[in-house]
């Protein structure tokens, strides 16, 4: 028996891909990473990964964490930039004996040295939304944030092991 749950509708396609893995006896760790990568790669989610909204300076800074329920290992990145899949970096960091949480430039440098894909995460769509928001701020005509935020995934595999992951464009 296996199981999986994720936050928000935006994770649906990733959960379906991960479901195939779990049905094929894959590990919960692979399932969590697969599900979250699907969300990170989709350019129309403005709160996670590629297409996520940039910060005040126009830079897409992302956060991700990965936790292994069997070993209690954790890996995390915060403020990472120009990396295609922060969840994959966080997962690899969970296997590091020391310094399993990297922030900002240190997170990005770790990812580049480890061979992760460098990618400009700012899409034209996200840039336009950001520019509109800057104009609203200047005009003091603000509305509450519209949309969902961080994606979170929990998976249990057929070996009764559990893993958890989360990703956000901060």
Predicted feature residues:
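Alpha/propeptide regions of enzymes that mature by internal proteolysis
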Residues: 1-170
